[in-house]
Amino acid sequence: MREGKRKNMSNKKVLTGIVVDAKCDKTIKVMVSRMIMHKTYKKIVKKRKNYVVHDEHNQYKCGDVVKIQEHIPISATKRWIVI
């Protein structure tokens, strides 16, 4: 029973971010912000990273908040999809 539940669970990463670019066809750029503590100075620092994400129906615009999930490579740079 326990093994059956484990097969259904996904171990892919899910992140939340803001769409910063939606100019390309079926592709958006999503900026994900994280707050981390600096190891030496113990100060909270905001880290940002942009992800190239597959948007199948071109439904997202700049400023939208989206959830993205890891996926098999779709192109040379796209490894995330919108959920």
From Swiss-Prot:
Annotated Gene3D superfamilies: Nucleic acid-binding proteins
Nucleus among keywords: no
GO annotations of cellular component type: cytosolic small ribosomal subunit
GO biological process: translation
Keywords: Ribonucleoprotein, Ribosomal protein, RNA-binding, rRNA-binding
Pfam families named in the record: Ribosomal_S17
CDD domains: Ribosomal_uS17
Gene Ontology MF, one: structural constituent of ribosome
Role played: One of the primary rRNA binding proteins, it binds specifically to the 5'-end of 16S ribosomal RNA.
Record text on subunit structure and interactions: Part of the 30S ribosomal subunit.
Family of this protein: Belongs to the universal ribosomal protein uS17 family.
Name of the protein described by the UniProt record: Small ribosomal subunit protein uS17
Taxonomic path: Bacteria, Pseudomonadati, Pseudomonadota, Alphaproteobacteria, Rickettsiales
Encoding gene (name): rpsQ
